Amino acid sequence: MIKKSALITLFLVSLILGVSLSQKPFYCQAPEPTPSLNTDGLTLKMVQILTRHGDRTPLYSTLKPTMNTWDCNLGWLMVSSLNNVPGAATDVDRLFRKVYMPNREYFPGNCSDGQLTSLGFQQHLQLGQSLRQLYVDKYELLPSELSVDAASTIWVRSTDVPRTIQSVQGHLTALFPPTTVTSGSGIPIININTMDNYYENMTPNPTLCPELAVLIANTTTTPEWGEFITNTTQLKEDVMETLGISVFPGWSSLMDLFFATQCHDFPLPEGVTQDMVTQVYEAAYWQYQYQLSFPMIARLGMSTFLEEVVDNIRAFVNGTSSVKYIVFSGHDDSVGPFTNLFGLMKEWPPYASHVELELWSDEKDNYFLQFKFNGQSYTLNGCEDVMCPIDSFFETAYSILVPNYADACSNSTMTF
C-alpha cells in the first residue's frame, strides 16, 4: 500500500525539481490564469480546459556532437492494473519507474526527443495550483478534497503522448494535492482517456480528414506562398550553413530547437544569433497562421473537437451529465487551431498554454459562457460581453462547425 506520507514526499520532490524562470522568450511559459470578469450574481457551474503540455526537449536534433546535453530528472512511476472498475486503489503495494538510458537517446544525455522536462512538469503543477485557487477556493466549483465522488465529476482526456499525459498528471496533482485526498478510502483514480492517433481530433488530423491534406497542400501554390519562399530563401541557406545541415527540417522544427534551447538557458548552436532566432520564428509563425487563415482548413481541422466541447455544455445544461471539470491535454496544434477558430491566435501558443470555457448561471438558470485564453477573458464574435449568453455562443459555434463533416472530408473539389 502506498501511504499518504509517501505521496506527499513524491509531490514535494517534484516541486523541488522545478526550474525558476528568468527572462526568456514568450514561448517558454504562458501567463497564469486570472479571475473571471463580470461574475456578480452568477455561479460557476462547469469548466472545460484545453492545455498545451509543458516545457519539453526539442523534437529536432542536428545530430551534432556539439549539441547541448539534456538531463531529464523527471521520472514516471507506474503500475499496471487488470481491474478497470472506477473507484479507489486500495491494493497498490509497489510502483515501477520508466528510465531513459544515458547516451542511448536522440540527444546527448538521458532525454528522449519531445520529452517533458522537470520544468515542464513544474509548469503544470503551477497551472493546477492556480486553477485550484480559482475553481476550488474562489468559485467553489470543486470540493477542497478529492474523494471518489469528487473524482466522478472530473473527466480528463489526453493525446496518447507521454508529455501530454504527464502534464495533465501535474495539473491534477496540484489541483488536489496529496494532503487533500480523503483519508481511509484508498487512492482515488482519475481516468486519463486517450484514443488511437487515427481518430485523434484534438489536433488537425489529415488521416481522419483526407481533404484537409489536399487543402493544406493547395496553400503552397498561392502567390503569397511563393513570395514567402522567395523572401526566406537567404535565411534558409544561412541557417543551414550555420548548423552544418544538408536537409532543411522546416521552420517550425528550427524554431522549436532554438526556443527549447533558450528556455533552458543553454547556449544557442555556434553561429546562431538572436536576430536569426527571431527571423526563424517569424517565418515559422507566418507559415503556421497563413494555412490556418483559410476558413475551410481552420474549420475542418477542429470542427469535430469543437462539437465535442459544445456537446459537453449541452449535456450539462440539459441535466444529462454531472461532469463539471473537463480537461483536454494537448499540444500547440491543439490550442492554436482551437483559439484560431474564434480569431484569438496572435502568436505561437507557449508551453503550458491554457483555454478555459466557463459555464455560468444566474438565479433564474440563464446560462452564460466566458472564454478565457492565457489569462485574458475575450468577447467572442456574436457576443456583446465576455459573459456571453449561451444561445449566442451556440450560434457562433454552430456557424464554425462543418455540416456533413464526413462528406466534406472526402470532397476533392472543395475550395478554401
Curated annotation (Swiss-Prot):
Give the matching Pfam families: His_Phos_2
The keyword Cytoplasm is annotated on this UniProt entry? no
GO terms of molecular function? phosphatase activity
Of the GO CC terms on this record, one is: extracellular region
What happens biologically when this protein's gene is inactivated, per the record?
Cells die quickly.
**Would I find DNA damage among this entry's keywords?**
no
Keywords, sorted A to Z: Glycoprotein, Secreted, Signal
Lineage: superkingdom: Eukaryota
The record, for Gene3D superfamilies, names: Phosphoglycerate mutase-like (3.40.50.1240)
Its localization reads:
Secreted
Membrane spanning segments where? none
**GO biological-process terms attached to the record:** negative regulation of aggregate size involved in sorocarp development
**Where in the sequence is the signal peptide annotated?**
1-22
Q: List glycan-bearing residues.
A: N110, N218, N231, N318, N411
Share what the entry says about its subunit structure, partners included.
Component of the counting factor (CF) complex, which includes cf60, cf50, cf45-1 and ctnA.
For this chain, the family text in UniProt reads:
Belongs to the histidine acid phosphatase family.
Its annotated function is as follows:
Cell-counting factor that limits the maximum size of the multicellular structure. Does not possess acid phosphatase activity. Cells with decreased levels of this protein form large groups while cells overexpressing this protein form small groups.
Protein name as annotated? Counting factor 60
Q: Which organism is it from?
A: Dictyostelium discoideum (Social amoeba)
Give the encoding gene's name.
Answer: cf60
